[in-house]
């Protein structure tokens, strides 16, 4: 006979569907079409000229001192995998926007214990003047995390723990208590449950101090796992199933680095029952959005009341206050596209890469995918040490998001910034043709091209061919030229070198300045640094999120939008407590003409240049390839990029794809990364076509303060003075390089 059991009435959430200048200009410059005609057209093999897009960074001295780390760094412990636990500041925004409501609550679970809610017992208890009342807390279910359309990605569900329910035994001898406990544990194990080791002292201590509460003797079991075992449980004397809330990540591994995971806030108390003891473990966010919005997601606890008579016998237990669910976090992600991106990475990479897509007008992040990933459900309710060690020791670092926490040289994708900067400062125009040899001599170093091409080209063709000597010259050797400082200043305007201010632990990457150079290399900027930076190498490091963000500014043409990952935060009643509003991060109105020319070059890259493998069947596309060495030189590893925007004529989305190669692998952005892009967009053809027919969401308001004539003249004078100072600084740098060369310093070794 099954003993009377303490059954907690519990509320569950319904599962919703759930270099020196080389000649000024050739007499016969190449057009983009002529340049593209010379490109190989093999769509499968990796042509030599694409593979050789990788050009090793030229070391000018002091580089061995630097502490900048590329790639991803694995956490050393469980605690290191989570972001710092700081309070979440949620701005109170205006209402409006898409309404998302929390799902309705189920009715109370059936209560089988006749003492619960029994009016006669309540009346009897009220007549006992010496009765003691004890209130316990019932942790509330955590709220939902959804995609932009309300599709649930994380929710709470009811699960069960096998337990012993002693109650008040007539025979309270230690032998009888232990006999009952061991028989019950054995019966659960025979029924197919996993059980936990319990010592005799633990069993006896629980009976003496907490016998009116069930003792969990096994790990949590989800409803689908429990279903075939329920009938067996009914036959086990002193058995009990403790209902509790646990987290369910409905799409498994999808968006795991964004969602994060939860863990027990503290172990259940032992010893005598105290007021406000939880009846099961409280869960708290440990990583990702679960951590950042832990306060908003945490449910409001209910109150369970126990009453004992003067002899210590339980005379009443009831749910006095129902627990309430937490709020809802509505992200900017598109769940379908997120899944498609992760699938494309899995299919078209060696298991290591990233894909990011951003709305170019609103800054909403619609895809933030990284490979490899992990199943956050393994952390629920607690991950085993073995499973965690397997994840932590995996050389592919699945716990780290390459999309926002991996830093890499942006390689030739950064040439879009170099060209934009050169156009912005008047170093070149679209009609400026530069004679480009195979290599450019800067100081005592030869800065080479990735192919044997030579000729006179303009900036559009330079992007099509991904030509290095063009970039070297406009950045370092032409008169006038950009210089490293101005190039880095422009890079920062496009989001490089700083975190994105999203609710995730993203990395800032690195954009050097004079102070950084002195701290890291023991010297200031040199002309060779400008050359290295111009092709996205040297000390420049960025995340895939930053690269996609920068491209969104180019595609937008007027401003760099502020990135957003959360659309709305709702309270438990469905009231909007935060509403996303598009915002401008950087006003780029002074670069509109320059960015239009860059977009022209990026269109040509896909139509016939190094990025033609990214061409789509149903919509125009534009982009830029990139390939670079990264990591330790001894590893001989390369990475491939493809970053762009679509549609090419009226840009809606900017994106960046990253492919991490294995040691000694011959790769190129135009082959590997472009394939990731094409496979992704073709797989979402139907939904993307539908999305492109919907009017685009409102853009951010760009400041339009017009300058007075006096202010305009002052601005021109400031820019002229800035250009003169930059030119003078370059002259000083060249003089320094000559002196160092005479003293034998610039042989590449660090200054001692």
Task: Give a label for each model feature.
Residues 1-26:
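Sec-dependent N-terminal signal peptides
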Residues 71-73, 77-80, 84-87, 91-106, ...:
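Small/polar-residue-rich segments within soluble enzyme cores
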Residues 280-307, 351-377, 487:
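Carboxylate/His-rich catalytic cores and anion/metal-binding grooves
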Residues 576-577, 581, 671-736:
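Short, gly/Ser/Thr-rich active-site loops of penicillin-recognizing serine hydrolases
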Residues 313-353:
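Conserved, well-ordered alpha-helix/loop/beta-strand core segments that scaffold catalytic motifs
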Residues 132, 137-141, 301, 349-353, ...:
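Short, small/polar residue-rich loop motifs at catalytic or cofactor-binding pockets
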Residues 154, 308-320, 359-412, 417-663, ...:
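Beta-lactam-recognizing serine transpeptidase/beta-lactamase-like catalytic domain environment
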Residues 26-78, 742-752:
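N-terminal propeptides/low-complexity segments immediately following signal peptides
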């Amino acid at each position: 006979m099954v003993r009377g059991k303490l059954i907690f009435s519990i509320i569950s959430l319904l599962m919703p569907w759930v270099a020196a200048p080389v000649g000024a200009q050739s007499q016969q410059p190449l057009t983009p079409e002529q340049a593209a005609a010379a490109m190989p057209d093999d769509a499968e093999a990796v042509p030599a000229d694409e593979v050789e897009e990788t050009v090793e960074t030229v070391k000018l001295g002091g580089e061995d001192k630097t502490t900048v780390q590329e790639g991803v760094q694995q956490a050393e412990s469980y605690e290191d995998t989570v972001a710092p636990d700081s309070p979440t500041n949620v701005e109170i925004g205006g209402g409006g926007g898409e309404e998302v409501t929390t799902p309705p609550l189920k009715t109370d679970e059936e209560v089988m214990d006749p003492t619960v809610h029994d009016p006669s017992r309540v009346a009897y208890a009220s007549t006992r003047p010496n009765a003691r009342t004890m209130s316990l807390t019932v942790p509330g279910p955590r709220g939902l995390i959804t995609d932009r359309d309300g599709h649930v990605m994380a929710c709470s569900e009811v699960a069960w723990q096998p337990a012993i329910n002693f109650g008040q035994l007539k025979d309270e001898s230690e032998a009888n208590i232990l006999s009952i406990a061991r028989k019950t544990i054995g019966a659960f194990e025979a029924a197919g449950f996993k059980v936990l080791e319990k010592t005799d002292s633990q069993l006896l201590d629980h009976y003496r101090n907490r016998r009116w509460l069930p003792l969990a003797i096994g790990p949590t079991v989800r409803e689908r796992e429990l279903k075939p075992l329920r009938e067996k449980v009914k036959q086990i004397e002193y058995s009990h199933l403790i209902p509790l809330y646990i987290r369910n990540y409905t799409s498994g591994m999808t968006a795991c680095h964004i969602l994060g995971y939860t863990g027990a806030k503290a172990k259940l108390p032992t010893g005598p029952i105290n007021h406000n003891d939880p009846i099961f473990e409280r869960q708290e966010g440990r990583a990702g959005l679960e951590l950042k919005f832990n306060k908003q997601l945490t449910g409001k606890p209910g109150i369970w009341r126990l009453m004992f008579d003067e002899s210590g016998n339980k005379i009443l237990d009831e749910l006095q206050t129902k627990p309430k669910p937490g709020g809802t976090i509505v992200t900017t992600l598109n769940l379908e596209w997120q899944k498609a991106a992760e699938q494309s990475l899995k299919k078209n990479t060696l298991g290591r890469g990233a894909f990011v897509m951003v709305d170019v007008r609103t800054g909403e992040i619609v895809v933030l995918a990284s490979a490899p990933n992990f199943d956050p459900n393994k952390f629920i309710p607690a991950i085993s040490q073995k499973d965690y060690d397997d994840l932590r020791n995996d050389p592919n670092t699945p716990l780290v998001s390459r999309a926002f926490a991996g830093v890499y040289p942006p390689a030739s994708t950064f040439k879009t910034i170099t060209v934009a900067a050169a156009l912005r400062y008047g170093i070149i125009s679209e009609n400026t043709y530069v004679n480009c040899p195979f290599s450019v001599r800067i100081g005592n170093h030869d800065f080479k091209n990735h192919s044997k091409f030579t000729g006179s080209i303009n900036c559009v063709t330079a992007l099509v061919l991904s030509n290095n000597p063009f970039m070297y010259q406009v950045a370092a050797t032409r008169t006038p030229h950009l210089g490293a400082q101005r190039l880095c200043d422009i890079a920062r305007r496009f989001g490089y070198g700083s975190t994105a201010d999203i609710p995730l632990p993203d990395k800032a990457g690195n954009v050097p300045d004079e102070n950084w150079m002195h701290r890291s290399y023991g010297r200031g900027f040199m002309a060779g640094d400008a050359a290295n930076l111009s092709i996205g190498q040297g000390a420049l490091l960025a995340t895939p999120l930053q690269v996609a963000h920068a491209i969104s500014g180019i595609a937008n043409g007027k401003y760099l939008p502020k990135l957003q990952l959360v659309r709305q935060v709702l309270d438990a009643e469905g009231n909007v407590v935060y509403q996303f509003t598009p915002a401008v991060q950087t006003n780029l109105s002074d670069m509109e003409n320059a960015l239009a020319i860059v977009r022209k070059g990026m269109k040509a890259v896909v139509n016939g240049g190094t990025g033609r493998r990214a061409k789509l069947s149903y919509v125009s596309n534009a982009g830029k390839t990139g390939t670079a060495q990264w990591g330790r030189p001894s590893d001989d590893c390369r990475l491939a990029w493809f970053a762009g925007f679509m549609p090419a004529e009226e840009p809606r989305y900017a994106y960046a794809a990253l492919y991490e190669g294995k040691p000694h692998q011959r790769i190129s952005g135009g082959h590997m990364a472009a394939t990731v892009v094409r496979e992704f967009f073709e797989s979402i053809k139907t939904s993307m076509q539908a999305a492109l027919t919907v009017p685009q969401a409102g853009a951010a308001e760009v400041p339009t303060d017009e300058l007075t004539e006096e202010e305009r003249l002052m601005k021109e004078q400031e820019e002229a003075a800035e250009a003169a100072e930059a030119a003078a600084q370059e002259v000083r740098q060249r003089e320094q390089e000559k002196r160092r060369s005479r003293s034998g310093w610039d042989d590449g070794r660090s200054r001692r």
